[in-house]
């Protein structure tokens, strides 16, 4: 469970980072 939770957190952070990168490129 802990490993799965960490994986989910990493995936969420990765997606958030991708969105932030796209936003910066648009700006």
UniProtKB/Swiss-Prot annotation:
- Membrane spanning segments where? none
The record's GO CC annotations read: periplasmic flagellum
Provide the alphabetized UniProt keywords: Bacterial flagellum, Periplasm
- UniProt subcellular location: Periplasmic flagellum; Periplasm
**What do we know about how this protein assembles, alone or with others?**
The flagellum consists of an outer layer composed of repeating units of FlaA around a core that contains one or all of five antigenically related polypeptides.
Role noted for this protein: Component of the core of the flagella.
| Listed name of the protein | Flagellar filament 34 kDa core protein
Annotated organism of origin: Spirochaeta aurantia
